[in-house]
Each structure stands twice: as C-alpha cells, then as structure tokens.
C-alpha cells in the first residue's frame, strides 16, 4: 500500500468514526468520504464534525457540499 493510499484510508476511517460517534450510520461516512475525495477535504470535514457536532444528517451533507464546492473553485 502506498503512502498516499494509506493516508486516504486513515482519513476515511477517521471521518466514518466521527460520523458514527454522532449517532449517524456508517454509510453516511462512506458517502461523505467518496464525495470529498481527498484526505485534506476529509480532515476539514472531521474538524467541522468535532467542533459543531451537528444533530441532523442534512447539516453534514450541507457542509460536505460546501467543502466540495470550495475545492472545485
């Protein structure tokens, strides 16, 4: 496994774990990781989850879309 692949896997795992800690299904974390697409974006999402602790899945999806939008610019 390359370093980049290992870094991606670690970021994905951390993101899924943070989402599960908040009471959301693992599938939401998997979908977020796929859409965010990079460890840097996933770490931004992890920071959001740890600081805001959103209560609704919609807030997680909104933040994911905002991060994706910023990356595309």
Q: Predicted regions: what is each one?
A:
Residues 44-73:
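Long, compositionally biased
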């Amino acid at each position: 496994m390359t370093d980049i692949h290992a870094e991606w896997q670690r970021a994905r795992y951390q993101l899924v774990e943070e989402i599960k800690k908040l009471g959301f299904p693992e599938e939401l974390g998997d979908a977020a990781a796929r859409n965010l697409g990079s460890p840097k974006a996933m770490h931004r999402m992890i920071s959001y989850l740890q600081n805001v602790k959103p209560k609704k899945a919609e807030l997680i999806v909104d933040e994911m879309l905002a991060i994706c939008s910023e990356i595309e610019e």
